[in-house]
Each structure stands twice: as C-alpha cells, then as structure tokens.
C-alpha cells in the first residue's frame, strides 16, 4: 500500500487542528464554570522547563503551517505569536486552517524527494527529503505540541478525553 504525502499531511493537520480547537473551547468553558482565571491554563506547563500552553499551541500550528507550505513549496504566512487569550489562540487556529485548506494534493504529491532545509532555532541546518521531513520531523513535532497542549489541560482538571484529543475522523 502506498500513501501520498498529501494524504499523510493535510487531512491529518486539519483533523488535529480542529480537535485542538475543541480542547481549547472546553478549557475556556471549564475556566468560566469554575471561576478560574483563564491565564492559569494559558500559562500552565507540565514541567518548569517546558513551554506554557500558549506557546505549545503556537508551535503546533506553526508546524501545521510550515510543513504544509514547505512541502507545497509556497510562501508561508507570518504570524507574530503574540496570542495571550483563548480567543486569540482560536483565531490563530482558524487562520492556519484556512491556509492549510488552500493547499491541494497536486501541490504536495510527488514532492517526496525535494530538499527541505531547517534551522531549528540555531545556525545549524538539517537537510531532509520531503518524505523524511514530513514523517520523521514535521509530524512528530506537530503531534508532540498538540499532545502537550492536551496533557497540560487534562493535568489541570479540564475534562477532556481521547475523543476530544482525536476530534472528528
């Protein structure tokens, strides 16, 4: 069985971004119902040396945007990562979903062998083929930050479960 780069990326990003949006909606409702300042959740971390929830969401959506755009070899929209509220995070997800939805299968399929160069926060660069970039770097990074977003909220008492994490499929 073969699977196209498009099938392994765009539908996955859409499903999980929508699911993450749903988890954030539940978190905001939980904060309201329990009279908890939303910043308690937005700034929560799993460990002191990890990013807070806001940054986890920003990084997750950045990977969905970046991986999709790099595979399609198109210019990436730039966002300033200044979100501080649930509403602003939801708006960011909506923007990235809109961008991801513009990418068509013919823009990605057949790009398994293109070269993608990353500079992961340092001057060092890493070179990937399109396929390796998606499967060994992009998707694992995306899922790490989506999962960490979920875990932060669940750890802090938000009633979310596996169905919330996975969303509609």
What name fits each language-model region?
Residues 25, 94, 98-101, 144-154:
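A broadly conserved amphipathic alpha-helix scaffold signal in soluble, globular proteins
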Residues 3-10, 14-26, 39, 48-69, ...:
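Aromatic-residue-lined binding/catalytic grooves and analogous aromatic/hydrophobic interfacial grooves
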């Amino acid at each position: 069985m073969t699977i196209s780069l498009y099938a392994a990326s765009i539908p996955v990003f859409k499903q999980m971004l929508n699911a993450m949006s749903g988890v954030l909606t539940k978190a905001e409702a939980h904060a309201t119902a329990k009279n908890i300042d939303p910043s308690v959740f937005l700034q929560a971390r799993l460990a002191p040396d990890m990013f807070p929830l806001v940054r986890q969401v920003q990084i997750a959506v950045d990977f969905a945007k970046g991986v999709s755009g790099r595979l399609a070899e198109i210019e990436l929209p730039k966002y300033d990562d200044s979100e501080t509220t649930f509403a602003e995070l939801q708006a960011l997800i909506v923007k990235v979903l809109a961008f991801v939805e513009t990418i068509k299968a013919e823009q990605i399929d057949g790009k398994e062998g293109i070269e993608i160069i990353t500079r992961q926060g340092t001057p060092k660069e890493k070179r990937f083929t399109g396929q390796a970039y998606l499967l060994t770097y992009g998707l694992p990074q995306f899922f790490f930050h989506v999962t960490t977003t979920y875990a932060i909220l669940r750890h802090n008492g938000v009633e979310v479960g596996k169905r919330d994490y996975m969303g509609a499929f």
